[in-house]
């Protein structure tokens, strides 16, 4: 029997953290963070990490598990999340994944799996490379590789290219999970306004101090490349004004939110929930309860 997993996804600033905590409390669950930046210790504000009070309200995993000097990959996330899901289930609780890093979550819950640990790391690295390509470039690669993909589905093209590259080492096996995807969204302008307001709140909470520490101590770290950090480096070097840096964070965050929604819409079988819609919580509760009772 497959393990049932609730998955709360959506663009940045849409309200995933609050919903995840609500569901964990209501359905005896524990939260696994599906965010590639929240793994880093000391980077609390810019990553919009759940506050100490929020983390006390529900058990959270995969937050503060890496130093900023360390890298983090989809392969590491998959390995650690699998172990956590098994542990959470063994204690009679419900695994709830909350985050916006689509590649990590999809790699865990869907797709092909390799037998060897080294091969698994290689295929996830290759998948990340393919994900950076445009639809047009992927279709060109598929044609060059002689792939015939029905409907030119981006996800099928990527899987086909993975099969072509890794051949018999790549097995089309079931993931062992039965996910219920709850994708939060909102009207674009409402979401963009919320993003802008959150950046302002981050600044008031001390984001610049957090960025300054990272810039002084570990400017070359993978963690420093995240949105909310890298935009301030030109300001700290005297190249742009603070207002320009803040505006760049807001703009990049809005663009990231748009990319996230495109990812979830095109590559994962998700149900969308408009957070500003009346009674949206009741709809979500009903979906979860029907899923768990099935």
Swiss-Prot record:
Reported cofactor(s): Mg(2+)
UniProt entry keywords in alphabetical sequence: ATP-binding, Magnesium, Nucleotide-binding, Transferase, tRNA processing
Enzyme Commission designation: 2.5.1.75
Residue numbers binding ATP: 10-17
One GO MF term attached to the UniProt entry: ATP binding
Function noted in UniProt: Catalyzes the transfer of a dimethylallyl group onto the adenine at position 37 in tRNAs that read codons beginning with uridine, leading to the formation of N6-(dimethylallyl)adenosine (i(6)A).
Name of protein: tRNA dimethylallyltransferase
UniProt lineage: Bacteria, Bacillati, Bacillota, Bacilli, Lactobacillales
């Amino acid at each position: 029997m497959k393990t049932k997993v609730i998955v709360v996804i959506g663009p940045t600033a849409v309200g995933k953290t609050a919903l995840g905590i609500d569901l964990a409390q209501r359905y005896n669950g524990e939260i696994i963070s599906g965010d590639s930046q929240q793994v880093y210790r000391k980077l609390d504000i810019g990553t919009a990490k759940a506050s100490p009070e929020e983390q006390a309200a529900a058990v959270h995993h995969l937050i503060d598990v890496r130093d900023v000097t360390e890298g983090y990959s989809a392969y590491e996330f998959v390995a650690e999340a699998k172990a956590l899901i098994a542990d959470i289930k063994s204690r009679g609780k419900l695994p709830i994944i909350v985050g916006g890093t689509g590649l990590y979550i999809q790699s865990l819950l869907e797709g092909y799996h390799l037998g060897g640990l080294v091969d698994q790391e290689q295929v996830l690295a290759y998948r990340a490379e393919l994900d950076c390509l445009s639809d047009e470039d992927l279709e060109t690669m598929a044609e060059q590789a002689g792939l015939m993909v029905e409907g030119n589905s981006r996800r099928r093209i990527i899987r086909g290219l993975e099969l072509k590259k890794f051949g018999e080492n790549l097995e089309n096996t079931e993931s062992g999970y039965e996910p219920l995807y709850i994708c939060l969204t909102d009207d674009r302008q409402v979401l963009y306004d919320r993003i802008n307001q959150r950046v302002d709140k981050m600044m008031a909470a001390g984001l610049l101090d957090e960025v300054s520490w990272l810039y002084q101590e570990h400017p070359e770290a993978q963690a420093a490349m995240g949105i909310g950090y890298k935009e301030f480096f030109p300001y700290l070097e005297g190249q742009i004004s603070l207002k320009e840096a803040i505006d760049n964070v807001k703009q990049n965050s809005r663009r990231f939110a748009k990319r996230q929604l495109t990812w979830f819409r095109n590559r994962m079988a998700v149900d969308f929930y408009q957070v500003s819609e009346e009674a949206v919580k009741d709809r979500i509760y009903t979906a979860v309860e029907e899923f768990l009772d099935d």
